[in-house]
């Protein structure tokens, strides 16, 4: 019983420590990475290039899961898309 509690505690701790982020990928101008006219699987490949676990086209932009913390994702609060 103690072993089971210890095992579950370790799993919870791993889930807290290995925290990944998710969000919309950005292009070089700070805009969401468009997938409007891209082929199927485009966003999954782009997310994989950024070391994400998966991604899909959340029309019309690429949304990724499991991204490392160093990857910049689009944020409404810090949006610089189309602004000079």
UniProtKB/Swiss-Prot annotation:
InterPro entries: LCN-type_CS_alpha_beta_dom (IPR044062), Scorpion_toxin-like (IPR003614), Scorpion_toxin-like_sf (IPR036574), Scorpion_toxinL (IPR018218), Scorpion_toxinL/defensin (IPR002061)
GO-annotated biological processes: defense response to fungus; killing of cells of another organism
CDD domains in the cross-refs: neurotoxins_LC_scorpion
Residues that bear Cysteine amide: 81
UniProt tissue specificity: Expressed by the venom gland.
Domain annotation LCN-type CS-alpha/beta: ranges: 21-82
Disulfide bonds: 31-81, 35-57, 43-62, 47-64
Post-translational modification: C-terminal amidation is important for high activity.
Signal peptide: 1-20
Temperature dependence (free text): Optimum temperature is 25-60 degrees Celsius. All temperatures tested are optimal.
GO cellular component, one term: extracellular region
Site (Important for activity): 32, 59, 74
UniProt keywords, alphabetically: Amidation, Antimicrobial, Disulfide bond, Fungicide, Ion channel impairing toxin, Neurotoxin, Secreted, Signal, Toxin, Voltage-gated sodium channel impairing toxin
SUPFAM superfamilies: Scorpion toxin-like
Field pH dependence: Optimum pH is 4.5-7.5. Is almost completely inactivated at pH 11.5.
Domain writeup: Has the structural arrangement of an alpha-helix connected to antiparallel beta-sheets by disulfide bonds (CS-alpha/beta).
Note in the entry: Is the main neurotoxin of the venom of T.serrulatus. Negative results: does not show activity on Nav1.1/SCN1A, Nav1.7/SCN9A, Nav1.8/SCN10A and the bacterial NaChBac.
Family label: Belongs to the long (4 C-C) scorpion toxin superfamily. Sodium channel inhibitor family.
Protein name per Swiss-Prot or TrEMBL: Beta-mammal/insect toxin Ts1
Protein source organism: Tityus serrulatus
């Amino acid at each position: 019983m103690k072993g089971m509690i210890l095992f579950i505690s370790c799993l919870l701790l791993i889930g807290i420590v290995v925290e990944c982020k998710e969000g919309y990928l950005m292009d070089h101008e700070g805009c969401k990475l468009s997938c409007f006219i891209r082929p199927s699987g485009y966003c999954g490949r782009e997310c994989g290039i950024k070391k994400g676990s998966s991604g899909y086209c959340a029309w019309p932009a690429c949304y990724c899961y499991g991204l490392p913390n160093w990857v910049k994702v689009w944020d409404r609060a810090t949006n610089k898309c189309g602004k000079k």
